[in-house]
């Protein structure tokens, strides 16, 4: 029996549909019965409407017109206009992309092919130093240079690689380039992430060591040192006058920023006096009078400042997130303070680059730069290949101090990101001449290869992109025009058709589904194009594009796909060959869903290469309206290759090995190679249905509701044929019928002639019924209001002859009962009610010579795919668990399809009647409430008297009525039973009150002894705790059922006690309560008295006492007792949708370890996760939930029962929580999950892994 909580809430009726139906009913009610003809039915169904002008206007909003059954506008066709507009914009964008990058306004980025953001950051900063770029351009290779042996750096190859990178960045027409891979190989950089500032320092040191070994390297090294190398002087001064100085070369400044918030404050601390308390003067031999100070003696043109953003603590190295305010211009005296023997050429230094380390700690992050262009003086954000202008320059306009920053913090002004994460600052000396000179490019012989490669790649890609966009736009416009023409032919109205059989009905959802799937297929290419691919996919795609572009540049004629089977002069031939190859590889029946089919279709379209635009016009003349063309490929199959001979491109055709089929035979190309677009759409369509009336014909209700559309017959049948729809009728009793195709009907479909006239007449009867019922309902309400005058109890006076009694309950439910009776009568005559199903039939393609059949990728409609495993999808993804075998349901479906191949559609009904559907209707008998179980008049029901005329109005709605005359007497047996019950209840209430007074003290003594757990020496017997609870809750209102002393819940099947006394584990279960002999006799005597008073015929049964000696239960059944204890213990671990608490503990934090199993509220709440689980869930499912919260992979999680206790490793993943004995709501003793940190593997190519700054380049060329 269904619980009330499981019942579905009653659905509210659609008021719009009710209004349409009531409008039709009112029209029929106002019509005489002899005038209800077929013409009137057509009028009521609104099939006499003219063309709908309300929705003929263009609108981007979809809406189903329910006022006019002929209106098929705005079902989804309007979305195609937007798609064409987007494709036209894409075409224009492709033409714009043919324009070269503005070399003066848009910098080019560097693609990050691995964990090389630190290399890109270094290169992009120093590329924007014109002096350094010119220095690289001026380097010349030498034939006399002998490359050193590994691991020493090949300085010539390195300088030429830098030259190639800088030249490409300066001249490439693309917005990004990938030129860092060659430099990484020369420097033997691994895939680990490194520190950007350390890389720059190591790189310049390596150049200093290796350039002197090159014939042309000494001049380059001198210019390099003059650019960024300065000289500092460290002075140690004593108060006695002793003074010592030491000069050294300085490449960069490393500032400690802990405790400082501005760059000037950090510089003051760096260049300020430092007192050496432990230093002893060699002259005066005194300690504590010595000071140390550093200062610049010679300032370089470019000053590099590195901000030390990490510190060492007891917890390891931590990143400093201190905001650092730095100025856009800084005076030279901030660096050169005391020694002015060599004054700087300029008084100011301007900020031109900021290196930013983005990340939460010192072990992980990502580098990017903010750089000022030396050409246009604009600021840009260089984030690998993404380069964008920033509206506001970084830094502060003027130098600030700590005092200024304190007022800023007081005003609660937020710090910008560049100040919170700046890691390196670069300042350039402000010289007298501006702008800076544009670097002169290297000689032509050094850059000719790169120049040619860039030009060929740009011309090939842009031309290919434009032609592909033009073809896609043409195909899209052609397909959309075809859909518009098809739907235009479908539209009809009263002026266009002459006979009713010229109008057919199609489900509105079918028309919408066709348009929706046409739209999805049409936008498939664009959607896939805009979808953001992963980094590995992008890299692969770039390699393929480069290879294809090189082939295009080698020959202007080689614009077709290299995989095409034979050269052709039309785009259709090229597309057909590509499509055939893709389809041949996927001919094996594969249980993929419709979404996978759509993705495959989109990928097929992407593989198709582009043909010249002039061929599209030739193709347009040969195309038909209903499908894309198919091309027969002649034998033998030839494969086209290009070969360069004497500077000219030659085409060589060689016979390709025939593709082998799945059964080992060679396949042929006799079948068409191009799949029509309509077949692709059919693979995505769902099932649709039209409800049939109870007479097996077309009901008028779907027409009124707008659920079906009236369309022209011939175009409708053509539409169903194009998308391969099949129909069947499924009756409510489970019978399936495949109707025969009638004359001139390729597909069975309802026409206007099939409108059921019986249902139309029933609608008229329904209107009359409702009107009459409304009048009689007023009569019923009047009878109920006159209850005092009509009730047999409130007005016991004698009634006139012929008056009858009606149950008050029957009158209260009169309207509902009347409508149910009518529905039952209709249901008995409506034995053919069901639905007409439209299902897109699976397509079959048969190879002529291969000897096997292939199925389409489309799944059976209405049957969703079942999961290949009971493990959740997320678990399959994480642990790569899953089966590649086909589900049994899929195999069964395909076997059934294969058996029916080649046979015609069944024309006879399939005997599949469901016996459960043939349930007899319940008969409704009006006023049956007054019939008692003895066959007389029920004494317990309220009865209201009605006149014979009123009774005639009431009984007309029912086939069966129970007449009760007012003169008839009620059932004597029912009357006597009521009297006895009343008298017995009063006596029992009094006895209960007296008994409670007598046993009150005894009951309190028993309860107090049970709570204190005292072992009384006088305890002789045991009684069930359930009886004590019932006795305590007994009141005078429950007098009719006094509790009995039943010991069954304490006795096992061996009639021995198996439950013990009260303890912590069984406080919710029944247990033994100890009683003295006097207490036992008191309870037994009082209950006997109540039982005897309640029923004189009752037979007294002595309860079975449970003897107790010396506080122990006698004759305890040990076997059953052990089983009961085991069952009680297991009950703790059986739960449904309860919380499992898991605490995340970091072993590096002593506080976490101390509070891992803490009892304090704050200790428990820290890093505590509550996860809803059931005892039947597996441990893997719990770990998957923890993965969502902690991002630790399930198989890597260190999960323990307690801190230092049992570990739940991988071997326990498939065990349930019940098997592992995990109790719910364990917030006092949660599971322990150890926090972990993972470092990236060598194969990872993202920038989100761990980074360890300044850990060196030991294994690279920079260290030798």
Curated annotation (Swiss-Prot):
Q: Where do the TM regions start and end?
A: none
Active-site residues are: 117 (nucleophile), 366 (proton acceptor)
What highest taxon heads this organism's lineage?
Eukaryota
Q: What is its EC number?
A: 3.4.19.12
State the signal peptide span. none
Q: Which InterPro entries match?
A: Papain-like_cys_pep_sf, Peptidase_C19, Peptidase_C19_UCH, USP_CS, USP_dom
Q: Bias regions of kind Low complexity — which residues? A: 565-575
A Gene Ontology biological process noted in the UniProt record is: proteolysis
Coiled coil: which residue ranges? 516-547
- Where are stretches of biased composition, namely Basic and acidic residues? 403-415, 532-543
The UniProt entry, under PROSITE patterns, shows:
USP_1, USP_2, USP_3
Reaction equations catalysed: Thiol-dependent hydrolysis of ester, thioester, amide, peptide and isopeptide bonds formed by the C-terminal Gly of ubiquitin (a 76-residue protein attached to proteins as an intracellular targeting signal)
Relate the outcome reported for changing residue 101 to K.
Answer: In ot872; temperature-sensitive mutant
**Where would you find this protein in the cell?**
Nucleus; Chromosome
What's a single GO MF annotation on this record? cysteine-type deubiquitinase activity
**Pfam families named among the record's database cross-references:** UCH (PF00443), Usp-48 (PF24543)
- Protein name per the record: Ubiquitin carboxyl-terminal hydrolase usp-48
């Amino acid at each position: 029996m269904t619980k009330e909580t499981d019942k579905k809430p009653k659905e509210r009726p659609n008021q719009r549909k009710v209004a349409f139906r009531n409008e039709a009913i009112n029209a029929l009610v106002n019509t005489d019965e002899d005038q209800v003809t077929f013409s009137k039915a057509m009028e009521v169904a609104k099939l006499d409407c003219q063309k709908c002008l309300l929705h003929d206007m263009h609108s981007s909003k979809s809406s189903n017109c329910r006022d006019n059954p002929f209106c098929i506008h705005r079902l989804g066709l309007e979305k195609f206009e937007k798609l064409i507009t987007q494709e036209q914009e894409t075409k224009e964008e492709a033409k714009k992309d043919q324009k070269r990058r503005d070399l003066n306004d848009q910098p080019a980025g560097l693609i990050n092919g691995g964990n090389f953001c630190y290399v890109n950051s270094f290169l992009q900063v120093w590329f924007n130093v014109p002096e350094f770029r010119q220095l690289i351009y001026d380097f010349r290779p030498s034939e006399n240079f002998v490359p050193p042996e590994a691991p020493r750096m090949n300085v010539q190859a390195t300088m030429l690689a830098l030259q190639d990178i800088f030249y490409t960045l300066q001249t490439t027409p693309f917005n990004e380039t990938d030129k860092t891979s060659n430099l990484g190989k020369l420097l033997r950089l691994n895939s680990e992430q490194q520190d950007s500032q350390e890389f720059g320092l190591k790189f310049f040191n390596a150049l200093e060591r290796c350039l002197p070994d090159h014939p042309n390297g000494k001049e380059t090294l001198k210019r390099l040192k003059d650019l960024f190398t300065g000289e500092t002087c460290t002075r140690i001064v004593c108060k006695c006058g002793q003074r010592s100085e030491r000069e050294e070369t300085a490449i960069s400044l490393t500032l400690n920023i802990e405790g400082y918030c501005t760059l000037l404050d950090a510089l003051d601390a760096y260049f300020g006096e430092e007192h050496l308390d432990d230093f002893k003067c060699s002259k005066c031999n005194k300690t504590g009078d010595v000071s140390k100070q550093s200062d610049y003696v010679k300032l370089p043109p470019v000053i590099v400042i590195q901000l030390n953003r990490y510190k060492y603590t007891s917890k390891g190295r931590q990143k400093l997130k201190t905001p650092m305010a730095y100025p856009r211009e800084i005076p030279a005296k901030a660096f050169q303070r005391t020694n002015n023997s060599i004054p700087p050429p300029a008084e100011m230094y301007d900020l031109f680059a900021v290196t930013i380390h983005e990340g939460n700690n010192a072990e992980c992050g990502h580098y990017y730069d903010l750089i000022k262009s030396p050409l246009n003086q604009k600021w840009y954000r260089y984030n690998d290949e993404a380069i964008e202008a920033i509206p506001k320059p970084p830094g502060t306009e003027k130098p600030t101090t700590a005092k200024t920053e304190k007022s800023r913090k007081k005003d609660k002004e937020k710090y910008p990101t560049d100040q919170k994460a700046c890691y390196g600052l670069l300042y350039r000396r402000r010289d007298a001449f501006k702008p800076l000179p544009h670097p002169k490019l290297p000689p032509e012989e050094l850059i000719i290869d790169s120049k040619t490669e860039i030009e060929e790649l740009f011309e090939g890609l842009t031309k290919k992109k434009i032609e592909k966009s033009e073809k896609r736009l043409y195909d899209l416009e052609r397909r959309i025009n075809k859909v518009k023409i098809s739907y235009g032919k479908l539209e009809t109205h009263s002026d266009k058709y002459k006979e009713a059989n010229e109008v057919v009905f199609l489900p509105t959802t079918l028309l919408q589904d066709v348009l929706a799937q046409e739209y999805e297929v049409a936008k498939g290419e664009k959607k896939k194009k805009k979808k953001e691919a992963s980094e590995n996919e992008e890299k692969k795609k770039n390699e393929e594009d480069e290879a294809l572009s090189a082939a295009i540049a080698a020959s202007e004629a080689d614009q077709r796909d290299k995989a095409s089977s034979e050269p052709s002069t039309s785009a259709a031939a090229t597309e057909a060959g590509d499509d055939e190859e893709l389809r041949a590889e996927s001919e094996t029946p594969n249980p993929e869903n419709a979404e996978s089919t759509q993705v495959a279709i989109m990928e097929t379209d992407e593989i198709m290469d582009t043909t010249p635009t002039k061929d599209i016009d030739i193709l347009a003349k040969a195309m038909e309206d209903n499908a894309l063309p198919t091309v027969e490929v002649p034998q033998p199959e030839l494969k086209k290759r290009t070969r360069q001979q004497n500077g000219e491109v030659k085409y060589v055709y060689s016979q390709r090995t025939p593709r082998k089929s799945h059964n080992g035979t060679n396949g042929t190309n006799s079948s068409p190679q191009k799949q029509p677009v309509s077949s692709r759409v059919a693979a995505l369509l769902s099932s649709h249905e039209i409800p049939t009336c109870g007479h097996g014909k077309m009901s008028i209700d779907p027409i009124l509701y707008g659920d079906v559309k009236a369309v022209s017959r011939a175009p409708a049948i053509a539409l169903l044929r194009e998308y391969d729809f099949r129909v069947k009728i499924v009756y409510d009793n489970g019978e399936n019928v495949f109707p025969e195709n009638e004359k001139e009907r390729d597909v069975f479909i309802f026409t206007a002639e099939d409108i059921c006239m019986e249902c139309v007449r029933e609608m008229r009867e329904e209107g009359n019924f409702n009107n009459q019922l409304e009048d009689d309902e007023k009569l019923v309400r009047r009878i109920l209001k006159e209850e005092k005058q009509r009730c047999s109890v409130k007005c016991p006076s004698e009634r006139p002859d012929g008056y009858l009694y009606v149950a008050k309950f029957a009158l209260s439910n009169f309207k509902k009962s009347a409508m149910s009776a009518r529905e039952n009568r209709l249901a008995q005559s409506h034995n053919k009610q069901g639905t007409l199903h439209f299902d897109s039939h699976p397509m079959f393609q048969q190879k002529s010579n291969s000897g096997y059949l292939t199925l389409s990728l489309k799944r059976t409609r209405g049957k969703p795919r079942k999961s290949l495993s009971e493990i959740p999808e997320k678990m399959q993804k994480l642990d790569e668990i899953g089966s590649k075998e086909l589900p049994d349901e899929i195999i069964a479906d395909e076997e059934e399809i294969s058996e029916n191949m080649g046979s015609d559609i069944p024309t006879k009904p399939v005997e599949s009647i469901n016996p459960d559907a043939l349930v007899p209707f319940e008969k409704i008998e009006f006023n049956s409430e007054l019939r008692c179980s003895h066959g007389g008049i029920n004494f317990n029901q309220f009865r209201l008297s009605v006149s014979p005329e009123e009774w005639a109005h009431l009984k007309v709605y029912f086939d069966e009525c129970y007449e009760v005359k007012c003169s008839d007497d009620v059932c004597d047996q029912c009357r006597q039973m009521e009297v006895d019950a009343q008298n017995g209840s009063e006596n029992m209430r009094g006895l209960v009150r007296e008994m409670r007074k007598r046993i009150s003290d005894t009951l309190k003594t028993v309860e107090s002894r049970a709570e204190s757990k005292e072992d009384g020496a006088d305890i002789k017997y045991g009684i069930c705790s359930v009886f004590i609870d019932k006795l305590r809750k007994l009141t005078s209102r429950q007098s009719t059922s006094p509790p009995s002393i039943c010991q069954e819940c304490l006795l096992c099947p061996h009639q021995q006690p198996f439950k013990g006394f009260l303890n912590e584990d069984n406080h919710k279960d029944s247990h033994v309560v100890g009683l003295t002999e006097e207490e036992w006799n008191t309870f037994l005597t009082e209950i006997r008295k109540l039982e005897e008073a309640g029923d004189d015929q009752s037979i007294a049964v002595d309860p079975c006492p449970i003897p107790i000696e010396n506080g122990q239960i006698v004759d305890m059944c040990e076997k059953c007792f052990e089983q009961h204890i085991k069952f009680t213990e297991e009950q703790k671990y059986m739960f449904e949708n309860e919380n499992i608490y898991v605490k995340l503990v970091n072993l590096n934090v002593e506080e976490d370890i101390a509070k891992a199993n803490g009892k304090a509220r704050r200790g428990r709440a820290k890093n505590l996760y509550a996860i809803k689980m059931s005892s039947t869930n597996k441990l893997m499912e719990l770990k998957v939930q923890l993965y969502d919260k902690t991002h630790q992979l399930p198989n890597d999680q260190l999960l323990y029962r307690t801190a230092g206790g049992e570990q739940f490793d991988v071997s326990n993943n498939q065990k349930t929580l019940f098997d592992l004995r995990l109790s719910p709501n364990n917030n006092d003793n949660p599971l322990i999950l150890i926090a972990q940190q993972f470092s990236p593997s060598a194969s990872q190519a993202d920038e989100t892994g761990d980074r360890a700054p300044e850990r060196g380049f030991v294994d690279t060329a920079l260290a030798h």
